[in-house]
Curated annotation (Swiss-Prot):
Principal subcellular localisation of the protein: membrane
Its job: May play a role in signal transduction pathways that involve calcium as a second messenger.
Cited InterPro entries: CDPK_Ser/Thr_kinases, EF-hand-dom_pair, EF_Hand_1_Ca_BS, EF_hand_dom, Kinase-like_dom_sf, Prot_kinase_dom, Protein_kinase_ATP_BS, Ser/Thr_kinase_AS
UniProt domain EF-hand: residue ranges: 375-410, 411-446, 447-482, 486-516
Keyword terms of this UniProt record: ATP-binding, Calcium, Kinase, Lipoprotein, Membrane, Metal-binding, Myristate, Nucleotide-binding, Repeat, Serine/threonine-protein kinase, Transferase
GO molecular function, one term: protein serine kinase activity
Species for this entry: Oryza sativa subsp. japonica
Stretches the record annotates as Disordered: 34-58, 526-545
GO terms for cellular component: cytoplasm; membrane; nucleus
Xref: PANTHER family: SERINE/THREONINE-PROTEIN KINASE (PTHR24349)
Name of the protein in question: Calcium-dependent protein kinase 6
Residue ranges annotated for the Protein kinase domain, each copy included: 74-332
UniProt EC number: 2.7.11.1
Residue stretches of biased makeup (Low complexity): 34-43, 528-545
Length: 545
């Protein structure tokens, strides 16, 4: 829903959206490549506005569940920005004093059910991408009778776009570092079944004002979940950055790579590759796809950089580099930071992380996952449904193997079998929904204090403050884990050797690192997280920003 600070409007269905113009020239000039059909969900008929607004007056109309009042959790401070849908404020968490940005969206501005769905999906996608070091972190969402409030990480360093304007263009070294961040976000989105659809320099903010500050991707208001092979037709995005297949209403995630290629061109030259005095003139230039590498500063730019841009801006999309291939391009990885092997999808890294956990931790994660909100789980729910091809409610080995292949994995069969065994906590031979969610949801959701307290209380049935052998045996029976060595679990977690597990020992077990994915997509093993951190995800090092 618009910019991080401005709360601008960008509904995929709004008839007044500036992106939805007459693309007659596309059909006249490119009839073989343009299509008006789509597998994307149709908006269908609209309900009367008055009836729609009456429904929105409920404090659960958008999120679908009750939330605490925003001002019970945060104090709201100065205004940071304002746009068509609402206002962004500085807010301070009452319990910790930590500062965040709060985007308050006026429900009266949501004129259709499609607008409501856009807000709901934006929140779901932000939760789904949580933990990536270059994606702004959502802290929570709140709803009352008048507003939906999205509380997120505060980024005070300004827009990447402003940095481009200030400098005209970046050095190639700096541009390559920024490219790694931007395309790393694209790769992470695609591996999690998300298409961004509105990448642009304005949607990347600097965390702080320092020159070495990290970049954070914001604004997922136009982003959508996609399945491999799915085709979309709604024309969205920003004129300078939109891919030709989007104008032709027949596109997939490859469009994000085109958009990233446009950003790389701007980083190196200070001007967009497709420019005209009018919006339709811009679209015409996009469809022609002619690149200017003759004007300044291009004669001084390396051939490697120009090769990358050409390959990112190829049409048709099937000839374009994937996000992973961009990260492996020599211009991007000249300093050795870019990955030297295919990136496993982020979900795959989480499965590997899960496989290193003991059985008590796996049970605890299942307990926590069951209590996560719908918007936190929506993305993983879609991935589960995509893998569960026979809709049986459980993923078989063959379904897991095929699903991982479609999401970009090239694991050997033995490795997939290991992941299957790790996720199949009850040893039924399949992965049910609870097991899938527990194995793939990012740990920053699972390590929050309220979740840990609830999970500990689940095991500590008598409220004594300790998990005993009897209570652990009871929990194992509930989870169909009859073969678990109770004594071994107690011995592993019980740090003071009193034969039981207190809350501190339980938290230490839950926060102990196993395998994590770092900003450039590579896996590190045995990397512990600190007990005081709310977000166990690592940050991108200065060499990879």
């Amino acid at each position: 829903m618009g910019n991080y600070y401005s709360c601008g409007a960008s509904s995929t269905s709004s008839p007044t959206s500036p992106s939805l113009v007459d693309y007659y020239y596309c059909y006249h000039r490119y009839p073989s490549s343009c299509s008006s059909t789509s597998t994307a969900t149709s908006s269908g008929g609209r309900m009367p506005i008055r009836s729609h607004q009456q429904r929105l007056s409920s404090p659960t109309a958008v999120l679908g569940h009750e939330t605490p009042a925003l001002r019970e959790v945060y104090t709201v401070g100065r205004k940071l920005g304002q746009g068509q849908f609402g206002t962004t404020y500085l807010c301070t968490q009452v319990s910790t004093g930590a500062e965040y940005a709060c985007k308050s969206i006026a429900k009266r501005k949501l004129l259709s059910p499609e607008d409501v769905e856009d807000v709901r999906r934006e929140i779901q996608i932000m939760h789904h991408l949580a933990g990536h070091g270059s994606v702004v972190t959502i802290q929570g969402a709140y709803e009352d009778n008048l507003y939906v409030h999205i509380v997120m990480e505060l980024c005070e360093g300004g827009e990447l776009f402003d940095r481009i304007v200030e400098r005209g263009y970046f050095s190639e070294r700096k541009a390559a570092e920024i490219t790694r961040v931007i395309v790393g976000v694209v790769e992470a989105c695609h591996s999690l079944g998300v298409m961004h659809r509105d990448l642009k320099p304005e949607n990347f903010l600097l965390k702080e004002s320092s020159s070495s500050s990290s970049l954070k991707a914001i604004d997922f208001g136009l982003s959508v979940f996609f399945k491999p092979g799915q085709v979309f037709s709604d024309v969205v995005g920003s004129p300078y950055y939109v891919a030709p297949e989007v104008l032709c209403k027949h596109y997939g995630p490859e469009a994000d790579v085109w958009t990233a290629g446009v950003i790389v061109y701007i980083l190196l030259s200070g001007v967009p590759p497709f420019w005209a005095e009018t919006q339709q003139g811009i679209f015409d230039a996009v469809l022609r796809g002619s690149l200017d590498f003759d004007s300044d500063p291009w004669p001084t730019i390396s051939d490697s950089a120009k090769d990358l841009i050409r390959r990112m801006l190829r049409s048709p999309p099937r000839e374009r580099l994937t996000a992973h291939q961009v990260l492996c391009h020599p211009w991007v990885c000249d300093d050795g930071v870019a990955p030297d092997r295919p990136l496993a999808p982020a979900v795959l890294s989480r499965l590997k992380q899960f496989s290193a956990m003991n059985r008590l931790k796996k049970m605890a994660l299942r307990v926590i996952a069951r209590n996560l909100s719908e918007e936190e789980l929506a993305g993983l729910k879609e991935m589960f449904k995509a893998m569960d091809t026979d809709a049986s409610g459980a993923i078989t080995f063959d379904e897991l193997k095929e699903g991982l292949r479609r999401y970009g994995s090239n694991l050997r069969e033995a490795e997939i079998r290991d992941l299957m065994d790790a996720a199949d906590v009850d040893k039924s031979g399949t992965i049910d929904y609870d097991e899938f969610i527990a194995a793939t949801v990012h740990l920053n959701k699972l390590e929050r204090e309220e979740h840990l307290l609830a999970a500990f209380a689940y095991f500590d049935r008598d409220g004594s403050g300790y998990i005993t052998v009897d209570e652990l045996e009871h929990a194992c029976r509930d989870h169909n884990m009859a073969d678990v060595g109770i004594d071994d679990i107690i011995r592993e977690v019980d740090q003071d050797n009193d034969g039981r597990i207190d809350y501190g020992e339980f938290v230490a077990m839950m926060k102990k690192g196993a395998i994590d994915i770092i900003g450039n997509g590579r896996l590190t093993i045995g990397r512990p997280t600190t007990a005081t951190s709310d977000d166990p995800s690592p940050t991108i090092s200065s060499s990879s920003r």
